[in-house]
Amino acid sequence: MHSEPENCVIEGDLTCLIPATEAHLPLLADWFTDPEFVRNWGGQPLTREEVAAKYTGRRRPDVESFLILAQTVPVGYVQYAPAGPGQGGIDMVLLPQAQGKGLGPDAARALVRHLHTVLGWTQVTVDPEASNTHAIRAWAKAGLRPVGRQGSHLLMECLPAHSVSPTEIHDEGFPPRA
């Protein structure tokens, strides 16, 4: 493990997730106005007002928003939204310079583990662009598997193993290998 900030609420091996707040608006606004950052997040840069409304925690409890930190350095954003009892979806985006270092899969594993074990979710879904092979590989490393397509998106999900208690779920959402 590594040194974590005091406000780390979901901890991975390489990352920790902290709730996004209004105090993070300058950072988030810089990120979400950068065409490279949003290339795989809707593709269009957002205004500061849109970022404030969507990504600083104003939509809680409908959408929970987090900064992803590597050590104490912000490297990305992740959110989850319930879609029904025991299920919901995750969206995540990393800074281009943070990609390819295992940070995305680590943050995703930590969040999936939290959703399964703390919140009792039985189904976690993501929907990356089918052309975004980098994201698809990262989600697969986090334990999500393709289950279908919806338009230009690949639907992936992670189900906890049947007949395994939430405390026995391995990082990828499946029981540990023997």
Residue locations for each model-derived region?
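Conserved GNAT acetyl-CoA-binding A-motif
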Residues: 117-127
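A short beta-loop-alpha structural element at the N-terminal edge
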Residues: 15-30
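Hydrophobic alpha-helical core bundles mediating ligand binding, dimerization, or RNAP-core interactions
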Residues: 28-33, 51, 55
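Conserved beta-strand-loop-alpha-helix junction that forms the acyl-donor binding cleft
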Residues: 125-136, 153
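Conserved acetyl-CoA-binding loop-helix of GNAT-fold acetyltransferases
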Residues: 100-114, 136-141
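Conserved acetyl-CoA-binding loop of GNAT-fold acetyltransferases
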Residues: 140-150
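Acetyl-CoA-dependent GNAT
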Residues: 22, 39-99, 114, 119, ...
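Short acidic N-proximal helix/loop "leader" segments that mark the beginning
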Residues: 1-11
